Structures are given as C-alpha cells and as structure tokens.
C-alpha cells in the first residue's frame, strides 16, 4: 500500500530565533477617473510608495487600476485578508491606513475579556522571560 503525502502550503510561524513578517502582500486599488480616488492617486504619483518598497522588500506591493472606490487589500501569512476602503482620504491618511495594514498580524479581532490583561504598577518578581535571551541550557 502506497502512502501519499497531503499537498498543503506551510503556514509561516514565529518561534525561537526566527521572525516571519505577517504581512505578505498589499494591493493598492484605485480608479483613474473617480474623485474619491484622488488621495490614492496622489500617493501613487509621489515617491512614497517607492520608499515603502525599499524599506520593506519582503512585502509585495501590487497596484491595480479598477473602477470603484479605492481600496487597500493586505494578505497575511496565516491565509487571512484585510480590506480597507480609503475613499475621499488625503495622501497622509492613505499612508496611515497602509501602515495600519502593515503592522497588523491578520488575526480576527476579538473582544478581550475581563481577565485577559493584567496591569500592575510593580515590575514582575521573576522578570520577563524571552526565549532569545535565555541561557543555552534552557533552550529546547
């Protein structure tokens, strides 16, 4: 009996000694004619997108000319996608929304319960543990 492997794409995971950037691809969609795309068109004609491409070479930037309101669409390594409509926003607000998508991790937004976060004025007695700064004998 022959055993066949299951064809699946691997999901990027962060772990000890490795960091995988969560944002994989950002698509900038705009209309060449519509007035709501004016801020997006100004962003694309300025050199700001070139700076973003040089600063973040691991993110693929795609520019699409399509009728309708301008959109920013981000694809993440966990397979999720986030879309933000940037109609009637100026060039600075478009860049802020682009930064928001870049810094996001693609997870579903969840409501935090009462005991999810503990805030204290005192520092931790044990200190903050980090796998990158642990002694070699404690690493797995």
Swiss-Prot record:
Which Pfam family, any one of them, does this sequence belong to? L51_S25_CI-B8
**GO biological process terms, semicolon-separated:** cell redox homeostasis; mitochondrial genome maintenance; mitochondrial translation
Q: Which UniProt keywords apply?
A: Mitochondrion, Ribonucleoprotein, Ribosomal protein
Please tell me whether the keyword Zinc is annotated for this protein. Answer: no
Question: Record's superkingdom?
Answer: Eukaryota
Gene disruption: observed consequences: Has a respiratory growth defect. Shows complete loss of growth on nonfermentable carbon source and a gradual loss of mtDNA with replicative cell growth and an increasing number of generations.
The record's subcellular location field reads: Mitochondrion
UniProt KW Flavoprotein keyword:
no
> What cellular component GO annotations does this protein have?
mitochondrial inner membrane; mitochondrial large ribosomal subunit; mitochondrion
Give the principal location in a single coarse category.
mitochondrion
Q: Which GO terms describe its molecular function?
A: structural constituent of ribosome
Miscellaneous comment: Present with 3400 molecules/cell in log phase SD medium.
Chain's role = Component of the mitochondrial ribosome (mitoribosome), a dedicated translation machinery responsible for the synthesis of mitochondrial genome-encoded proteins, including at least some of the essential transmembrane subunits of the mitochondrial respiratory chain. The mitoribosomes are attached to the mitochondrial inner membrane and translation products are cotranslationally integrated into the membrane. Also has an extraribosomal function, being essential for mitochondrial genome integrity. May interact with MHR1 to take part in the mtDNA repair mechanism.
Listed under subunit, the entry gives: Component of the mitochondrial large ribosomal subunit (mt-LSU). Mature yeast 74S mitochondrial ribosomes consist of a small (37S) and a large (54S) subunit. The 37S small subunit contains a 15S ribosomal RNA (15S mt-rRNA) and 34 different proteins. The 54S large subunit contains a 21S rRNA (21S mt-rRNA) and 46 different proteins.
Q: Which family does it belong to?
A: Belongs to the mitochondrion-specific ribosomal protein mL43 family.
Q: What is this protein called?
A: Large ribosomal subunit protein mL43
Quick one: which gene encodes this?
MRPL51
